[in-house]
Each structure stands twice: as C-alpha cells, then as structure tokens.
Regions:
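Karyopherin-beta/Importin-beta family HEAT-repeat alpha-solenoid scaffold
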Residues: 1-769
Length: 769
C-alpha cells in the first residue's frame, strides 16, 4: 500500500514526461514475466501512475489501456486478472471521458467477459470497473451493449455471493443512470428483483446489500422517469418509511443511503414527493443543524492517547483540538440533500423554506468543515429560485403571508449580504470561487432586486481581486528565487489554477449582472472595469488574465449595447480583441474571436471600420496550419461562427460578399464545439428562410454545401447535448427547407447537391427525414 501511494505521488510530482519513459522501459518486461507477482506489480503500477500522467497517456488512450485489456481475461492467475480489471477502472476515471470515446469497443467486451470470471473477486471488481467506465461514457456508446450487460448483471444478482451482488447492484445503478430512458425496456425485469432484496435483506450482514438496493431503485426510478416508476412508487416509499420508522444503529450506513435515495426519488417524482416531506425533513434538518463535536485539551495530557478513527486532531500552541469528523460529514451530507430538495421542488418546498434559510445562511462561515460551507454557498441560488417561483404563483407561506415581490426582495436581502460578507472573510481560494459562482447565480435569479446590493457586491469583488492579485505577485516572486525547484513549481501551478477559477467566477458575476440589468448597470461597474479589468488586457499580463478581461468585455458588448451604451469601450477593446485572435494561447484566441462576432452583431455601424481587419484576422485563425488540431479547433470553430455574424450583420462592409458568404458556408458544418455548432446551424437555417441573396449563388450552385451541413447535423438532433449539432426545433426547420427545395429547385440541381454527400450521409439524411 505504501509503495502504491508513493508511486502515485511520484507520478503526480514528476509528470508524464519523466515517468512514462521509465514505465515504458519497465512494465512490458514485467508483463511478460512468468512470475505472477511481477505481472501483478506491472498492472498495479500502470493504474497508479495514470493520474499523474494524464496528458501523456491521453495521446494514445487505447495503447494505455491495452496491457490491462490483454490480462483481464487471459492471465491464468486471478490476482493478475483482478489487477488488470482494477487498472481498467482506474484508467477510465483518470483518462475519461476520452478513453470512453476512443476505446469503448475494446473495453466493454473485456469487462463483460470478466464479469463471468471464476473468481468472485474478479467478477465483483469487473462490475466496479463498469461503474468507472459508465460515469464518463456518452449513452450512445453503451447502448449496443446494454442487453448483454443487463443479462450479466442480473445473473450476478441471482448468484448468491454477497460481494458480487453488492457490486452488481452498484453497476446496475450506474448503468441505469447512464442509459436514462433507454433503461425503460429492462424496468419490468429489474425492479421486482430490487424490491425483493429490499424486503428480504435482513440482518447486519445484509445491511450494505439492502442499502445498495435502495440506491439502485432510486437511480432506476430517476432513469425511467415518473410515468413508468409511478405504479411502484407508493410501495417503494412505504418500504423506505417502514425502514426509517424502525430506526438505525449508530454504525448502520443505511441511514446515509436512505437520505440519498429520498433525494433521487424526489427528483423522479417531482411535486408528487411533496407529501413525503413531513417524513424526510425532520431528520434531515436535525442532521444539518448538528453542532460540531469539539474538545479542547492540553497537548501534554494526551501524548500517550490513541487517536480515534473519526477524530481529527489539530495542535494549536500547547492545546489539542479534537473534532469528530463523522458529525461534520453527516452535517455536510444533510446540507447537500437540502440543496437537492429546494432545487427540485421550488415553490413546493415553501413550507420548509424559512427553516432551511435560517439553517444555511449562518453556515457560510462554518470554518470547521469546507464541505458544509460549500453546501451552504451552493444552496442560496436554489433558495432564491424557490422563493421566486412561489412569488410568481402567489403562494401562501406557512405564516399566512402571500409571497409577493416584497417577500422576495426580503429573501434576497436575507441571503445576498451575508454571502458578500462571507466572501471577504473566506480563507480558502477554492471556496472564494464557489462564493463568486453563487453570487453570479443569485444575481441572475434576483434580477432587478439585486440592484440595491450592487455597491456591496462591487466592493466585495474589488477586495477579492486585490487579494488574488497580491497572491499572484507573491507566487511570481517565489518562482524567481534561486532555490525554486520543480516540486515547488507543481504546487505553484495548482495554486494558480485555483486562483484562475476566482477570476473566472468574477467574470461570471459581472456577466450575470450585465445579463440581468443590461446597460443601466454599466455606471456602477465602471470603476471595476477601469481599475481591474481594462489593465488585464495588456500584453504584459498572463494569458489567463487576458482571457478573463476579454470575456468580461465580450459580455459588456453582448448584453449592454442597447442605446449605444457600450460604445465608449469599443476603441479600448477592439485592438486587444483583434490582437487576441492570433494569441499563442488557444483560450485567449477563442474568447477573442467570439468577441469579434459579438461586436459585429451588436454594435451595428459603429463596428464597420473594424470589419476589414476582422475579416483578415479571422481568416488567419481559420487557415492556420494546425487550425483543426485538438488544442485549436474550438477557437477555429468560434472564428467561423464570428465570420458568419459578420456575413449576417455587417454585409454592407464586406468587399465581395457574393464570394465571402459562400466561403463561410463551405466551412460548415461545425462539429467540435457543440454549443457554437447549434448556434451557427440555426443561423444558417435563418439565412436560408430569409432567402439570403449571396448564400446559394445565382443558380443554387452552393446547395450541395447546405445539404452536407444538414446531412451531418440533422441526425444528431435527438442525441444527448454532448453530441447534438442542432436543436430539435432547428432540425424541424431543416426538414421543412429540404421539402420546400424539392418543389422549387430544378431536379438536376438537386441531384448535383445530393451527390455532394456520401452514400452513408444520404442514408442518414433519409432516415432523419
């Protein structure tokens, strides 16, 4: 165990460039050795170094997992097969989701075969590895294997060995979570099994089996949805209530599993769950309101004392502070569960909204446990959403007061100022970022009701940014010292990443205020923009700072240009934005080319003088030698999107639009940046519906390019968001346009356009139609 931990830490400290050559020189020979212990060691080592070597291994994920795939089912020794399966699971976690995308066809059959292993441990671990795999896998890649996988898991459930059954239940839950509605066909077979386990698993030795059955039932319910689960819901809820009424011993983890199951069932049943709140809420509020179990003693009194497993000890001077972590973990879990109920039920949660607010707000500075603070921070936007939903429906609070605008404003006033105050005192950079994220969300929900808190928010932003910039300067100073080494560099990089997240969330806060209040908020933001953001556009600042400054001004242009309010920033922003389009950093390029498109769309004639330079710069980005490389492709697709906006909104300023617009069309479809792809393909449809004079050409000679886009995008409309290239609404319009073209375009033109796509694309398009 110590050796494994050391290997993990060495890989993280030294990274792929140092560790992978050593591994490549050592592991293959060990894998071919006749001694099973050496083969076992090689596979364990491979799993341990993965986290630290992600960048290197991601270059060839199939090659990285190949040694494990070979040994998982073929090695004669069960402990080697176990190590191989363990390696597959670990690599799926560390190299996901790329490994699932690239190697699903190799990994899934191996795991399915390993589930039939003669060793219960290997079987059980194969099911556990399936959990790792499914968590990062798009449902489309799992679907072809679902029948075989479900058959295996059901066989394992019936097998009788408790360890195998427990792992099978966890895997079944994970598969249901991944498959979602596609799991419906297995529901009638699976649920009776699960209910049988829930009823029959009695005694201490079966506690975990029963707990995992709860977990599985709730995830299956969430996957198939309320309509299919509803006939069984009452029976399941009654079983859970009976178990809860019976109480749990202190060492019984069932209570924790039950709380999480209640939460999932709430998500499944929606408002039908409200009737069960009276059962669920009392113990949950009790857990959320637990006081920390803290003891302060003299350090010298306990030199010989044995430390308890769930007690954390901190030495402060000559004192010894003991904190019972199990209490804090229970409190944190309960707070997270409360967030879920508020989020799901919204106005339906109104009877409990006040006690939850009164529980959560004081926890913003609960310094005993970070997860408790994080949960409190995360709950506040959901609390406001619940209050807003109650206001819109004019619900009646338990006090008898109708929830109106005054009630909601009061709720905003109860939640937002303590969050701003907590931000200024928060010692952890990661939680500062979470607080800024929460503030951004609160501002978006509160809308005009945030106005009276803007001055305090901006003061909080200034204080946070000042502290962050000071810490950056201190880190840069440290990096310049003579004895600064690689290990310190690794730590500094991690600190910098956390600091960058603070700046990211600050930008999100400003964006949220601009989206909520538009141009009228600009005067209040002016000092912040002038003193902190504009200087970050300078070429001497770090790429991350430049990117964030560009993102902020992108938002200014996008959301505060009504009445020309943003034009005062145009001259100061256009230059850095165009320069950023060819920056060495891909993220700076992406933010910059996006900004060019925003200005083209929002600023009208005022942007006209910048159109020639913008066209030239975007062409540089799009035509760069490695424009479609993995690191650059998102910036490239955003550049194509911005070129489209210039074509649509700045047409009069384009020299030779009859050639530029078809050139833009020929760059489509977009396939990598799914958000931008959906936006651009919707724009294309909009331009076609408006009979754009330059898009198709005088004799519809560019119709083939349109058909190519439709053939790629249309079949994806029904897929998950990660794979969807056009919305369902856009797909409907594409179909209507194709039908319209069949009646209005000459047959020979249609034939020529149809021949521009492959037979496979033709078939996919016909099926989509």
């Amino acid at each position: 165990d110590v050796g494994q931990e050391c290997l993990d830490r060495v890989a993280i400290a030294l990274g792929a460039n140092t560790v992978l050559p050593c591994a490549a020189a050592t592991i293959p020979a060990l894998l071919g050795d006749g001694d099973w212990r050496k083969r076992h060691a090689a596979l364990v080592a491979l799993a341990q170094i993965a986290e630290g070597c992600v960048k290197g291994m991601n270059k060839d994920v199939a090659g990285a997992v190949a040694p494990c795939l070979g040994a998982a089912t073929n090695d004669p020794h069960p402990r080697v097969r176990w190590a191989a399966v363990n390696g597959i699971g670990q690599l799926c976690t560390d190299l996901g989701p790329k490994i699932q995308e690239k190697a699903h066809a190799q990994i899934l059959p191996v795991l399915l075969k390993a589930m039939e292993d003669s060793s219960h441990r290997v079987q059980s671990h194969a099911a556990a590895a399936m959990v790792n795999f499914s968590e990062g896998c798009p449902p489309e890649h799992m679907q072809p294997y679902l029948d075989a996988l479900m058959n295996k898991l059901l066989q394992m459930l019936q097998g009788g060995h408790r360890m195998v059954q427990e792992s099978a239940l966890t895997a079944l839950a994970s598969v249901a979570d991944n498959a979602q509605t596609a799991f419906a066909k297995y529901y009638s077979t699976v649920l009776p099994f699960l209910k049988q386990i829930l009823v029959g698993a009695a005694g201490k030795e079966h506690r975990m089996l029963r707990a995992k059955a709860m977990e599985c039932i709730s995830l299956v319910g969430m996957a198939v949805g309320k309509e299919q689960f509803a006939p069984d819901a009452r029976e399941v809820m009654d079983l859970l209530m009976q178990l809860q009424a019976g109480g749990f011993e202190d060492d019984d983890t069932t209570a924790s599993y039950m709380q999480q199951a209640w939460t999932r069932l709430c998500k499944c049943l929606g408002r039908d769950f409200i009737q069960y709140l009276q059962v669920v809420m009392p113990p949950l509020l009790k857990s959320a309101q637990l006081k920390p179990d803290v003891q302060v003693t003299d350090a010298e009194d306990h030199e010989e004392a044995e430390e308890e497993e769930d007690v954390e000890v901190i030495a402060v001077g000559d004192k010894r502070i003991s904190i019972r972590t199990s209490v804090l973990e229970e409190k944190a879990t309960a707070c997270n569960m409360l967030c879920c109920y508020v989020d799901e039920l919204k106005d339906g949660f109104l009877p409990y909204l006040q006690p939850v607010v009164e529980t959560m707000v004081p926890l913003l500075d609960f310094y005993f446990h970070e997860d408790v603070r994080k949960a409190a921070v995360a709950s506040l936007p959901d609390i406001l959403r619940a209050g807003k939903a109650a206001m819109l429906k004019q619900c009646v609070a338990p006090t008898g007061q109708t929830v109106d605008a005054a009630y909601f404003r009061q709720l905003v006033g109860y939640v937002v100022p303590p969050l701003i105050k907590a931000l200024s005192k928060e010692p952890e950079v990661e939680i500062q970022a979470a607080m800024l994220e929460s503030l951004a969300d609160c501002a978006g929900v509160a809308g005009e009701h945030i106005s009276e808190h803007i001055a305090a928010m901006i003061e909080g932003f200034q204080s946070t940014l000042k502290g962050s910039l000071e810490r950056r300067a201190e880190r840069n100073k440290r990096a310049g010292t003579e004895d600064f080494d690689a290990e310190e560099m690794e730590a500094l990089t991690d600190e910098q990443a956390a600091e960058d997240e603070v700046f990211d969330q600050f930008a999100e806060c400003v964006g949220s205020l601009l989206r909520s209040l538009h141009a009228p908020v600009l005067p209040a933001l002016e000092p912040l923009l002038a003193q902190f953001v504009a200087p970050m556009l300078g070429p001497d600042r770090s790429p991350e700072e430049r990117r964030i400054a560009i993102c902020v001004f992108d938002d200014v242009m996008e959301h505060a240009s009504d009445g020309g309010a943003s034009l005062r920033y145009l001259d100061g922003f256009a230059g850095p934005c165009l320069a950023g389009c060819t920056d060495a950093d891909a993220d700076v390029r992406q933010a910059s080319v996006y900004g060019v498109g925003v200005m083209a769309e929002k600023l009208g004639q005022a942007f006209a003088p910048h159109v020639p330079a913008s066209l030239q710069t975007l062409a540089q980005v799009i035509q760069a030698p490695d424009a479609r490389g993995e690191e650059n492709v998102n910036a490239t697709e955003n550049a194509i999107s911005s070129l489209g906006k210039i074509c649509e909104f700045q047409r009069a300023c384009i020299p030779g639009p009859e050639s530029v617009v078809p050139q833009w069309l020929s760059m489509l479809p977009l396939t990598e940046d799914k958000v931008e792809a959906r936006a651009v393909h919707t724009q294309l449809v909009r331009m076609l519906e408006a009979n754009d004079p330059h898009l198709l050409g005088p004799n519809s000679e560019h119709l083939g390019s349109v058909v190519k886009v439709f053939a790629t995008a249309l079949p994806t409309a029904g897929l998950s968001e990660k794979l969807q290239l056009c919305t369902v609404e856009c797909a409907g319009k594409m179909k209507a346009l194709l039908m319209q073209m069949q009646g209005s375009v000459p047959p020979e033109t249609l034939t020529r356009a149809w021949s521009a796509i492959t037979p496979e694309q033709q078939q996919a398009l016909q099926q989509a139609m």
